[in-house]
Amino acid sequence: MGFTDETVRFNLDDSNKKEISETLTDVYTSLNEKGYNPINQIVGYVLSGDPAYVPRYNNARNQIRKYERDEIVEELVRYYLKGQGIDL
């Protein structure tokens, strides 16, 4: 499979956006309750894909694995840009 010079469109449907946001909140809470640095652990998972960054506590690992990492990144970027006042 080769690369192309054409721009590829990536779209995440609206129903997943809210679910991803809720899942990230739940996972953050679970990580915090277990004494981990939630931001570091979530970043580790998103960058590596290794589910060991997220504990099984409160089913956090299974929750975050329901979504592709690119979907999580898209939601994080969207949330950040909205927070910067960019109309999406």
Curated annotation (Swiss-Prot):
Superkingdom of origin organism: Bacteria
InterPro entries in UniProt: IreB (IPR009309)
Pfam families named among the record's database cross-references: IreB
Species, as recorded: Streptococcus gordonii (strain Challis / ATCC 35105 / BCRC 15272 / CH1 / DL1 / V288)
Membership in a protein family: Belongs to the UPF0297 family.
Protein name per its UniProtKB record: UPF0297 protein SGO_2042
